[in-house]
Design a protein with these regions (language model features):
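Conserved catalytic core of the tyrosine transesterase superfamily
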Residues: 1-339
Length: 339
């Protein structure tokens, strides 16, 4: 008689998502959701490929060949970029590292999948907002309405802190330090906390917003809320920024050539700090980067800074270059042979 007992794959997936990722790895809900989406796509692909319901799939159905076929499917049929393909593969790798630890007898199986390499991708040019562009965008916002005041405070805080979108929407009243030294307490990736200094102007904006919403400082209430007084989501922030950019494009044509999104505000903060002479190590701590190499990319972005650096250095004058060497020889071949 058939039983409905879960197979090994089902049990491993349950332990991976219910215990390993949130408790042992301490991953954020967004990362867990990304991993879940990746494995759901994989299981659906396998179910379609093997013409079987996903509930009947077991660990033996998920080999290196199947994973490679899945990665090809992502790029060729779903038109995913190499970066998205690598994100999906990262989730699969994480799951099979867990499989290897839980079942050493499956180590060879796991190693074959862990041996599938990430694809080398072309890094895109990072689009960011210049300081003048940000000032213009903020000036267009109608601050005579509660929604306008919220949007202004939201974008100003994002530019001041360079915080990730999730860090902004997670910001609670207790995370605000609106007495000197002014700063925000942010919860970053990997649940790493950091303090970020804020300008007096940002302090005033946050104070007014809390007063208007009747939020008690020190409480657990989220600072940025929608019209239903529920916390803004990442998608809500994206919508607000998109709306503000569309309004600003009429006055700032240069915005039409840029691919901008909420993370662009973070890039804009980094470039503004770099232009102000702040060193990369400080910028790395400001943004909450765990690796300085992540911050180093900003040093290669701003072409104006490169031009100014070149202009500030006088080229070395080569006195010998004033005469062409081979003119003293009978032929150019003789000169080349003498090298």
């Amino acid at each position: 008689m058939k039983t409905n007992r879960p197979n090994m794959l089902a049990l491993l997936l349950q332990d991976f998502f219910a215990c390993h990722l949130p408790s042992l790895r301490g991953m954020s809900p967004n990362t867990i959701q990304s991993y879940r989406d990746s494995l759901v796509l994989l299981l659906r692909f396998l179910a379609s490929h093997k013409k079987r319901p996903a509930s009947s799939l077991d660990l033996g159905d998920l080999g290196a060949q199947e994973v490679q076929s899945f990665l090809v499917y992502l790029e060729q049929e779903r038109n995913n970029s190499g970066s998205t393909r690598n994100i999906r593969l990262s989730a699969i790798h994480s799951f099979f590292r867990f499989v290897a630890a839980q079942h050493p007898d499956r180590l060879e199986h796991a190693q074959r999948i862990l041996g599938i390499p990430f694809k080398k991708t072309c890094s895109r040019v990072i689009d960011y907002l210049e300081y003048d562009e940000i000032q213009k965008i903020l000036s267009i916002i109608d601050r005579s309405t509660p929604k306008g005041r919220r949007d202004y405070t939201l974008l100003a805080t994002m530019f001041n802190t360079g915080a990730r979108v999730q860090e902004i929407v997670d910001l609670r009243a207790r995370d605000l330090q609106l007495t000197k030294p002014f700063q925000l307490h942010l919860m970053g990736k990997g649940r790493k906390q950091r303090c970020c200094p804020i300008w007096p102007q940002t302090v005033q904006l946050l104070r007014r917003l809390c007063l208007e919403l009747q939020i008690d400082l020190g409480s657990e209430v989220r600072i940025f809320q929608n019209c239903r007084t529920t916390p803004l989501t990442r998608f809500g922030v994206r919508y607000i920024l998109k709306k503000c950019l569309e309004q600003a494009q009429v006055h700032i044509p240069s915005l039409q050539c840029k691919r901008l999104h909420p993370h662009s505000m973070r890039h804009s903060t980094a470039i503004a700090l770099l232009k102000s002479g702040v060193d990369l190590s400080t910028i790395s701590q400001w943004l909450g980067h765990s690796n300085l190499n992540t911050t180093n990319r900003y040093a290669t972005i701003d072409l104006d800074m490169k031009r100014k650096a070149i202009e500030s250095v006088k080229p070395v004058r080569d006195q010998r270059a004033r005469t062409t060497p081979w003119r003293h020889d009978h032929t150019i071949l003789e000169w080349l042979e003498a090298l």
